Design a protein with these regions (language model features):
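RNA pseudouridine synthases
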Residues: 1-167
Length: 167
């Protein structure tokens, strides 16, 4: 249910190329999210291993026997103790990585019903997490492609709510 930019390969050759970009950390993927609470550090690197949740096979969890997983976090804006607007940079790309890492740090993604506390004061249909930036070398030509989008409706709605409360 994450919104924003998405890469879909059209053929096997491009799929293989994309898989290698990810494996070699040559694909830069950044996300914007609203986290519950006041995240304690302005910059953080979360490097807890992630694996399948033993109690619920549809969920992932931080586990000592999990796969290495690294998420860089940078605070953009704080809203007191209620919420924190952050940029997240995936170094690895595990299933639900951002949601698992932030929940494990006791600051789940806002309105995340799977890993967080459910709906907050501002209702949205899904968690407030948006893929907003991609940078990679185009297959075959190696031309650098850089894509960036503005905050979507759900992110804007929650940001507006918290910004208006400060006034």
């Amino acid at each position: 249910n994450t919104s924003g930019l998405l890469m879909i390969p059209k053929n096997n050759k491009t799929h293989e190329y994309l898989a290698n970009l990810i494996k070699n950390h040559d694909l830069i993927k950044k996300y914007h999210a609203i986290l519950v609470g006041n995240y304690p550090r302005d910059n953080d690197v979360i490097s807890d291993p992630i694996g399948r949740n033993n109690l619920n096979p549809k969920k992932m969890a931080v586990r000592p026997d999990g796969r290495p997983s690294v998420t860089k976090l940078k605070v953009i804006e704080r809203f007191g103790n209620e919420a924190t607007y952050v940029e997240l940079n995936l170094i690895t790309g595990r299933t639900h990585q951002i949601r698992v890492h932030t929940s494990y740090k006791k600051h789940p993604v806002y309105n995340d019903t799977m890993y967080g506390a459910g709906q907050g004061k501002v209702k949205t249909e899904e968690q407030v997490l948006q893929s907003y930036y991609l940078k990679f070398a185009k297959p075959f030509s190696q031309e650098i492609i850089e894509l960036e989008i503005e905050p979507d409706e759900k992110l804007s709605k929650v940001l507006t709510y918290f910004r208006n409360r400060r006034v």
